[in-house]
Amino acid sequence: MRYAPLPILLLFAALLSACSESFTDPRDGQSYDIVKIGSLTWFAENLNFVTEGSVCPEGDSRNCDRYGRLYTWDDARTACPEGWHLPDSADFASLIEDAGGPAAAGESLKSSSGWFKKGNGSDALGFNALPAGYRGAVEIPGDAQSEQSAKYDGIGGYAYFWSAVATPDDLAYYLFLDFSSKAAGMNAFPKGDYRSVRCVSGVK
């Protein structure tokens, strides 16, 4: 019988250990895969902690199991468990840089399945970005524009992760990935929109 060299066995064991790392949220007992990328440790799943205002993608509770919940920016700021926080711009900048820079980071960050039109990523870093889509701000009865924006959209095609940083004109930044691009970038949308949350821990 032939045995693999010890260094290879140790490397394999280390990889298995990294893949199996998890964190259990003491507030509700839900467990999340986590991954260390650079100096930061990230949730490798979308947050699924129930807050009063959070919703499931497409309004379907089964989607919460797969994609986590969608949060307004105000909810997102306090949704992460103790010891974790909503990423700021520097956290996301570090993530994008570690994933190959703005032009290539989307490919490395997107999950290897679940994106439509051949939009899957390589998930090279284990971040496992999931295309949960979004929901517009809550509609105002009788306001046609708000009723349109309040609809769910983008599941399977887009991932949006809130940051902790707001703009002077009452918008908030988020990390954006889409099925048709290998890039990753930041944009800003109204704080009342519902988007995904990835919690992060560590010092940049």
Give the label of every model feature segment.
Residues 19-204:
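Conserved positions within compact, well-structured domain cores
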Residues 7-17:
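Bacterial N-terminal signal peptides
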Residues 1-5:
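Positively charged n-region of N-terminal signal peptides that target proteins for export
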